[in-house]
Amino acid sequence: MVSSGYLQAVMLLLAVQLLCFRPSDAEQEAGTVIPAESRPCVDCHAFEFMQRALQDLKKTAFNLDARTETLVLRAERRALCDCMPTNTLR
């Protein structure tokens, strides 16, 4: 079992280390900081890209929906044509 004196010494060293050594700032390590005014608006570009992608998806979904509806109507008409004479459908 570890003696209480040893535990106290370890706790004291940890406390001193936490008090004396402050964490380094990430900005200092990264180098110079570019002011926000001179940076391109990444969020704006991402938003515009996502808007265009969403519009493309909406168009594709609409086209697929219209195509599916056309195919379903064709299939229903063929099924009716198999059961009934052609002149009664019009």
Swiss-Prot record:
InterPro entries, A to Z: NICOL (IPR028147)
Record's subcellular location: Secreted
One GO CC annotation: extracellular space
Record keywords, A-Z: RNA-binding, Secreted, Signal
Domain of life: Eukaryota
Any one Gene Ontology molecular-function term assigned to this protein's record: mRNA 3'-UTR binding
Span of the signal peptide: 1-26
Family indicated by similarity: Belongs to the NICOL family.
Function: mRNA-binding protein which interacts with a range of target mRNAs and may promote extracellular matrix production.
Protein name (Swiss-Prot/TrEMBL): NELL2-interacting cell ontogeny regulator 1
Species in which this protein is naturally found: Salmo salar (Atlantic salmon)
Lineage, broadest ranks: Eukaryota, Metazoa, Chordata, Craniata, Vertebrata
